Every structure is written in structure tokens, then in C-alpha cells.
Amino acid sequence: MAYRIAIVGGGLGGLTAALLLSRSGHEVTLLEQAMSFRTEGAGIQLSPNASRVLERLGLGPTLAARATATTRSRFRHFRTGRTITEAVLGERAAMRYGAPYWQIHRADLHGALQEAAEATPGLSVHLGQAVRHDEIIHQGDQLSVTPVPGPFDCVIGADGIHSQVRRWCFGAAPSRFTGQVAWRFLVDSAALPSALKAPESQVWWGPGAHFVHYPVAQGRWVNCVAVQEAREWTEESWSLPGEPGALRSAFEGWHADVQALTHHAEEATLFKWGLFDRRPLPSWHRGPVTLLGDACHPTLPFLAQGAAMAIEDAATLNLALTRFPSLEEALSRYEGWRRPRTTRIQRTSRRYGWVYHLGAPIAWFRDRAAPLARARTMDWLYRYDPEAPDQA
């Protein structure tokens, strides 16, 4: 059965869902509050569980031309630089998991999805259309979203951690500060030694903090994310400018590679934000209205799975809406398929945030357990196919 679907939110999950659902024969209207699609942001790690969905959308060649193929992921000691554990990726990962591991700038990925959306018949995109929770009207069999003509059969909230659609479904829910703040910034690779430009992800573990970096934009930039423990934070935002001096001070005494990156941070790209968490929702849908991505299961960044979870959600939701004749059954099956995995990833990410920041002497035991734990986690994460959830 073909549905009339409104998707609120034009981020990575919303655009992926719009493309998949349109190509499955549904009539899709995408509502994005911004006047233009985002071009800011920083890097994203696209692991095989997400890249397989994008390849099936036909975006493989476009993304391969814009992304960096990750050769390995290394975890290092914050001061000595010693490699604690590493995972070989590249062709080996593509063969093992059936899809590539890419590092890509958010704007490059978003641009590829936007270009595909513009070329997709039956997909209507409305920019500058913010949706408030009180603008979703469900009376009897009629479902409408005030900013655009309806009616719709289904509304999908892909509008992020501050989701208005989630508020319509379940009311306002407070978020919890995790006690961690993060910086993100880009570094011009021309200013760096060759060791810092290698096509790999490096994660430095230190007491009370960690630091991640990898190249994006075909190696023109190195994307950096640094996380440090903090007592309080008053904003839940990605848009607060960071202070270069505070960043350098936070990682003073770390390995020379980390300090080289903090000293070459492009100030215009430096932002700081608090990491917030929410408890898993009791349900993901209310009537014909459902959620995906951060709107229903915001994920801390320690597994690099936030974008991947939204992309997986989109693929599984499309499968459910295409396979089952009843909308209620489709939304219930979508939730039933996805909830165990996303809840596990939320909990594992929280735990990794603690593990990454361990100090001596317990860090000694962590370092010796890391190789086996990392291999098990990678297999569970990356083998997953969101379009075959019965086999998970």
C-alpha cells in the first residue's frame, strides 16, 4: 500500500528515509526548518552497517569520490603515543562486512543525499518549514501538519534531539547532562606532518578525556573531536563557539601529535557543546506518528554510530511500511526490530564514555582487554543489515 507521508526534519536520517520511501512508491513530503540544507558541520564516520544502505540507494560512486576510505582505527595512549589496540579496515573490512568504512565531511554526505532527493520523482521538499508540536493535528482518520497542505497517512519525526514530533507524541522530556563536554574543529592538512594525514581514525585515551581525529574531504582537512569531563553545562547546542586557548589548555601535556592538532585548529570551525542523554522512550509511535534517529534514541558519540543509527532506522522503517499492509502493524514492527539494537548501542556508548577516560591503575586492565572487546563490538555493529532485521 502506498502512503502519504510527511517527514519532519531534513537531516541525514530524514533525507535517507525520504529517498527510500519515495523509491518504494510512497508520496513523501519533507519539511526542513532551515532555509537551505546544512553545509556546516564536521566529519562523520560511516561504518559498513550504514554505508551498505547508501550504496543500495545508488550513492556509492558519489560518496566514494567525496569520502576517505579508512584503512585502520588506532587507539593510543594519551602521553606516550603507544598503540593500545587497532583494527584493520580498508579492503579487509569491506570484504568482511560487505560494505566500506568511510570518513566523510557532513556537508559532502548531506549534499549527496540532497542531490538524490532533487532527482527523485514523488518527493516534495519544503525548506523554511519549522514544525511545532501543536501544528500536528490528528482527528479521527485525518492527519495534518499545519505548514503544508495535507492530509497525510503518516508523520515521521526526524527532527533531532529537540524533536517537536516527539513532544507531540509523548510530551516534553528533560535531557540529562552526562558530565562531559566536547569540542569539534577542522585542521588544514597542509599544516600537518604526514603521520597526521594518514587515512585512518586515531583515538587517544587519557584520564578524564579523549581525542579523536581523521581526515575528511579527500584529505584536505583533518576532523577533530575532543571530549573532556566537566561539572556543568547550561546549553544543549552544537553552535557555541569554542575558545582556542581553553582547548589547548585542556590537552596540555598530551602527545605532540594531539598538541599539533589543537594548535592548528581553524578557529572559525571550533565549537564546543555539552553531551546530553535521554532515557529510552517507552514507545516510538503514537497512532500514525513515529520517530527515527536522535528524535527517539539520541546516541552519545563514543561508538561513532549516531548518523549510522538514523540511516539504519530509515532503512528498516521503509521495509516495514512496504512489507505490512496495516500502518499500525508496520510501525509496531519497525519499533520492535529497532528498539533492542538502538537501546544496546545507547547503553554501550555510555559505557565507552567511561572506559575511554579511565586513569591508572585500572586503565592498565582496560588496555589489555581492549583488543578482544573491540573485535567483538565491531562484528556486532558492522555485520548488521537494517533491511534484513529478522536475521539480526
Regions inferred by a protein language model and the residue ranges of each:
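Conserved N-terminal helical subregion
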Residues: M1-I5, S22, S47-D188, R231-A250, ...
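Residues at the starts of beta-strands that form the adenosine-phosphate
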Residues: R4, E27, W221-C224
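Conserved mid-domain beta->alpha element of the FAD-binding
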Residues: V8-R23, E27-M35, I156-G157, W183, ...
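Active-site substrate-recognition segment that forms the wall
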Residues: P199-T234, P244, F251-G253, L275
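Flavin-binding catalytic cores
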Residues: S237-K272, L327
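C-terminal auxiliary extensions adjacent to catalytic cores
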Residues: P371-A392
